[in-house]
Amino acid sequence: MKKILLVFVCSLFAFETVLAQEKNAVGLRLGDGVEFLYQCDLSSRNFLQFTLATPHFEGLSVTGIYNWRCCRWNWTPQTCDWYLNVGVGGALGLYDFDDSGFLLGVAGSCAFGCHFKNAPISLEVDYRPVVGAVIGGGHDGFFDPGFWNFGLSVKFHF
């Protein structure tokens, strides 16, 4: 377990070092585990989001989601801009460190949040289901726990 944790931490730093050269966002998501995320703007209407996660604290997965910025509201013009983003993508990873099952699935995203005007920070409440198959390690079958993936995110934009 210590070796896996060390590999995870080293991978995280390497992942963030490579991606930090872009001028977009990095963040942390708490929900169905812990996720480190990177957001890469493609245009003013869409972006890619990549996460490195520990689903159910039982494995390690990578998710990529193509998102659309579908709605914007100016409910609190002095403090923040409110938004709704939706997206679709895929996930793969290891499920259950002890038995090494492989996870392959489809991911979705629906995020409601606010981007603060006076600080490069945004907060989100989201639903990000991952539905697919777990193969090997005695866990062959449908990955249904990923269907209940609600979370809170904080992002730092740069």
Question: Which positions does each model-derived feature cover?
Answer:
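Residues that define the transmembrane beta-barrel architecture of outer-membrane proteins
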Residues: 22-24, 30-34, 58-62, 82, ...
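Outer-membrane beta-barrel architecture
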Residues: 9, 37-39, 65-67, 109-111, ...
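Predominantly the C-terminal beta-signal and adjacent terminal strand-loop region
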Residues: 117-158
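Gram-negative (and chloroplast) outer-membrane scaffold detector with strong preference
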Residues: 42-127
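Positively charged n-region of N-terminal signal peptides that target proteins for export
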Residues: 1-4, 20
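Extracellular loop and loop/strand-boundary signature of outer-membrane beta-barrel proteins
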Residues: 23, 96-98, 136-141
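Sec/Tat signal peptide C-region and signal peptidase I cleavage site
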Residues: 15-21
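Sec-dependent N-terminal signal peptides
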Residues: 4-15
